[in-house]
Amino acid sequence: MKNILVIVDAQNDFIDGALGSEEAKSRIANISNKIKSFTDGVIITTQDTHQENYLETKEGKALPVAHCIQYSQGWGINIEVAASIIAKAATDPSVSYDSVTKPTFGSTELMEKIASYVGDEDFNITFVGFCTDICVVSNALLTKAAFYERANVYVDASCCAGVTPEKHNAALEVMKSCQIIVENE
């Protein structure tokens, strides 16, 4: 069975930048430990990616906080998370790495990458990252819908943070209702 670890939007703007929080900061060590313990599979990072005209977009009008502007400091993957991925890839030949940039919450490109990686096999996929109630839940539900019979979909709650703790918990409940396995609450 194939294994996938998806690190959703572990970007500076969601940790200590424009949309950062203490909860997100406190999850970085957990994410790094999750990377270090991962074996025999692929690690995929997603990056929320917007352009300079973000505030003029539909999302920008609904969430008027410029964030994750492509190539800005806030768009970058957190240095501790990036270092953990690099160290893992350099020392464990059973682990490969891929990435997806995405302009919206859920990523159809991520679904395509998952499909190309797993082929017709059953697989385990674990989601970690930010924000639990926006991009983590969107991608976990897309995966559950796209690969329902073949995927064991997990979310590690100890490696996620939402916009608020209440929204984080609400998203976890929604995912459990949709038969996503939530671990480490």
Language-model features: locations:
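Active-site-adjacent betaalpha module
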Residues: 2-4, 30-36, 40-41, 65-185
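Short, hydrophobic/glycine-enriched beta-strand segments
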Residues: 3-10, 14
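Active-site metal-binding loops of divalent metal-dependent hydrolases
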Residues: 10, 48-49, 130, 159
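Active-site loop signature of alpha/beta-hydrolase-fold enzymes
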Residues: 13, 52, 161-162
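Active-site neighborhood of HAD-like aspartate-dependent phosphohydrolases
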Residues: 13-19, 32-33
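Short glycine-enriched, charge-decorated loop/helix-capping segments at active-site entrances
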Residues: 17-25, 62-68
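Von Willebrand factor
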Residues: 35-53
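Metal-dependent catalytic neighborhoods of phosphoester/phosphodiester hydrolases
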Residues: 54-59
